[in-house]
Regions:
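His/Asp/Glu-rich acidic catalytic environments and adjacent acidic regulatory segments
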Residues: 1-196, 211, 291-294
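Active-site-proximal, well-structured secondary-structure segments within enzyme catalytic domains
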Residues: 41, 45-46, 74-77, 84, ...
Length: 325
């Protein structure tokens, strides 16, 4: 369904952002902005609205706009398919642990979280919280390698191979950028960002790269020294980095976790929003798309309703990585 709906939404968005009549009205207001006496906020809103139309391609000829809309629709379908493949591959991978050797090093909290009553085993998946916890805690090197490769090789073969999709997306983005007068998709994306250009982004990365690489080499040497006769591998990094942190700084993340319970973090975020922006959050009984969804009525300083804030804080197989709200 998602692969059908997203292209439809893209068509509707393009019908607005590429609309010649609507763009002409925005342009007339923008061209006369100096005489309108706009305040700072309205002036900024006008600037961003005009820019959005320009960057969508509204100023181009009907033929070019038609091509841009067609490319946008195709990209929308491909990016959705890419994300679905990744999600399905993430859901499909399961590492079942049944012996003491296989769960060596895992904390009681983590073992409790991954216990599967039906399978009578501890089951590790590829969602980030489960994956990273296992890679940090597990003493079983071969299982860390298996999980690492399971994560790394998602959507790289068979019907869910994202390689051809990524290539097609890149080609379409390059074609769209050329139609709009940009040297590349990267030039288009970075035009109004801090880096301004691909070269600006690369220059910044190189400033970090040299000292970062030197530090990484030192850390790798330290971790290699911790391996008795074995060669350091990528799947060792999380596990040995945590051991190194404990040795050097006596910093155990498990000891700080009680201070970062969901309730505490959420209360802190709401308090900060109230202090900075005068927002208040009141929990309301609204049915969500999942039983774990919690909704809040958001109001301003005067108590005026601003919107509904719905939180979906817990990882599950059907969610994309990072989709917490």
């Amino acid at each position: 369904l998602e692969t059908e709906i997203y292209p439809m939404l893209t068509r509707e968005y393009d019908a607005i952002s590429l609309n010649e009549v609507l763009y002409d009205r925005v342009k007339k207001v923008y061209d006369s902005r100096e005489s309108l006496g706009l305040n700072e906020q309205d002036s900024r809103l006008l600037e961003l609205t005009h820019r959005s139309f320009i960057r969508s391609g509204a100023a181009f000829s009907p033929d070019v706009k038609s091509k841009i809309a067609s490319i946008n629709e195709e990209i929308s379908g491909l990016t959705t398919k890419f994300a679905q493949n990744l999600l399905l591959e993430t859901k499909a991978f399961r590492l079942e642990l049944k012996s003491d050797e296989e769960i060596s090093g895992l904390s009681d909290d983590f073992k409790s979280a991954i216990w599967d009553e039906e399978k009578e085993a501890w089951v590790v998946g590829l969602n980030r919280s489960s994956y990273e916890s296992f890679m940090v805690q597990s003493n079983n090197r071969s299982l860390r390698e298996k999980l690492f490769n399971g994560y790394r090789l998602r959507a790289t073969q068979g019907d869910r191979d994202n390689g051809p999709i990524a290539i097609q997306i890149a080609k379409l983005r390059a074609e769209r950028a050329e139609l709009m007068g940009y040297e590349s998709h990267a030039h288009y994306v970075l035009e109004y960002n801090m880096a301004k250009s691909p070269q600006g982004a690369e220059d910044f990365l190189l400033k970090v790269w040299t000292p970062g690489l030197e530090q990484a080499k030192k850390e790798r040497a330290d971790m290699q020294a911790m391996l008795a006769g074995e060669t350091f591998q990528a799947w060792d990094w999380w596990h040995l980095a945590e051991k190194l942190r404990l040795q050097r700084y006596e910093l155990d993340e498990n000891q700080t976790k009680p201070y970062f319970k969901l309730e505490n973090v959420q209360a802190g975020a709401f308090a900060m929003a109230e202090k900075l922006f005068g927002l208040s959050f009141e929990e309301v009984d609204v049915e969500g798309w999942n039983p774990v969804v919690v909704s809040f009525d958001v109001k301003d300083r005067e108590g005026k309703h601003l919107g509904l804030f719905m939180t979906d804080m817990y990882a599950r197989d059907s969610k994309r990585g990072g989709a917490w709200m």
